[in-house]
């Protein structure tokens, strides 16, 4: 079964109905039909949540978070030694954000494709690490 790793920017694109939202929606619909699996690290979900809190009242952000958690997305709240070491390595080597290091490490360790639009962060990494990118735009 195909595995995707959800980056915060991809989920935010869906929530904001930005360019690429249709790609994210299609992937989530496929997961609803058990055609693929989606994992999102809790560090990336935190990025989504704090963006929601900044944009709306906390009660609205909490409601949207609950809706996200009802989608067919497995939230990984664990930091295995393998994820820990890979995230630290990637953050140091590429000077990326803390949360982005977890998304990349999750994708690299699990072999899943990272659903993202973060070209400014990840273009330098594509082709240099064993990470597949699923660009939404």
Indicate residue ranges for each PLM-predicted region:
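Short, well-structured N-terminal submotif of metal-dependent ribonuclease cores
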Residues: 1-40, 53-66
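Short beta-strand scaffold positions
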Residues: 6, 39-40, 78, 98, ...
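Alpha-helix capping/helix-boundary segments
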Residues: 10-11, 44-45, 83, 103, ...
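Amphipathic alpha-helical segments within well-ordered protein domains
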Residues: 12, 46-49, 88
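Residue-level detector of structured alpha->beta connecting loops
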Residues: 32-35, 72, 95, 111
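Helix-loop "lid/cap" segments that line or gate small-molecule binding pockets
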Residues: 51-52, 73
């Amino acid at each position: 079964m195909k595995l995707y790793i959800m980056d915060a920017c991809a989920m935010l694109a869906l929530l904001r109905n930005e360019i690429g939202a249709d790609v994210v929606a299609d992937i989530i619909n496929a997961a609803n039909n058990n055609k693929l699996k989606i994992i999102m690290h809790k560090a990336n979900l935190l990025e989504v949540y704090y963006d929601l809190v900044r944009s709306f009242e906390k009660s609205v952000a909490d409601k949207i978070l609950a809706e996200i958690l009802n989608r067919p997305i497995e939230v990984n709240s664990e930091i295995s030694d393998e994820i820990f070491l890979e995230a630290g390595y990637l953050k140091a080597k590429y000077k990326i954000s803390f949360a982005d290091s977890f998304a990349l490490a999750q994708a690299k360790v699990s072999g899943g494709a990272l659903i993202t639009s973060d070209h400014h962060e990840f273009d330098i990494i594509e082709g240099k690490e064993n990470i597949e990118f699923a660009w939404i735009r």
